[in-house]
Amino acid sequence: MNIRSFIVLLVSTLLLAASGHAQSNARENIPNFDSRKYHFGFLLSANSSSFFIDYKPDFSFNDSLLGIENVPQAGFNLALLASFNPIKNVNLRFVPGLSFQDRGLNYTYLSDGNKVETYLKRTESVWLQFPLMLKLRTNRVGNFAAYGLIGGCYGIDMQSQKDVNEAIAGKIVVKLEKTDITLDAGGGFDFFLPYFKFGIEMKTGFGMKNVLIQDGNQFTDPISNMRTRTFVLSLCFEG
């Protein structure tokens, strides 16, 4: 799913949610939804991914390397949802899924002829993710409620280039570790429609470990620590 398709889907579902919410004064949709302990559903998401970068303390940009710039790239997520409701307005959510992420680093160099040249090094990943989130929700008002999220995620990069042979690949690769752990936080809104609950949520993930593999090349030498950062906008469908 590209960004344009996601926006069309978002607008369509927002109109559907608004229609359902407008009827809140007439009737309350799925009134027994919160009385059930377990709920299941799925999420469709768009993401934007980049890095937190720390440079080596003894490194200074020289006449050749002028700078390194983060270039966030777009991607998407597909996930299943299992939710346990132990007490009112508190949910424990397990959201396993796939996250297709793309990150970019722009390296700017000054060549011998005083010409500025930029090289974009991209790191593409397909993460198998296992997030566990705590959802804290407000009381339901008609067919609407707001909520906050906090939790963590363990991920395995199914497309990791950690062990790639650069001699065979024919290029220098910025290699990343195969696993990552993130701290996630965000919030959203629930709309209770006639047959299911629809949610819109925004979430940010902060990597907790250094994922950069030091290969001793010109692209990794200036960097001491590199952690992932991801922003996710999701549409949640829950029954």
Q: Whereabouts are the PLM-identified features?
A:
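Bacterial Sec-dependent N-terminal signal peptides
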Residues: 1-27, 237-239
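Short, well-ordered amphipathic alpha-helices
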Residues: 22-25, 80, 131-136, 187-188
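Extracellular/periplasm-exposed beta-strand and loop segments of Gram-negative cell-envelope proteins
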Residues: 50-73, 101-127, 155-180, 210-230
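Gram-negative (and chloroplast) outer-membrane scaffold detector with strong preference
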Residues: 34-38, 46, 50-52, 81-162, ...
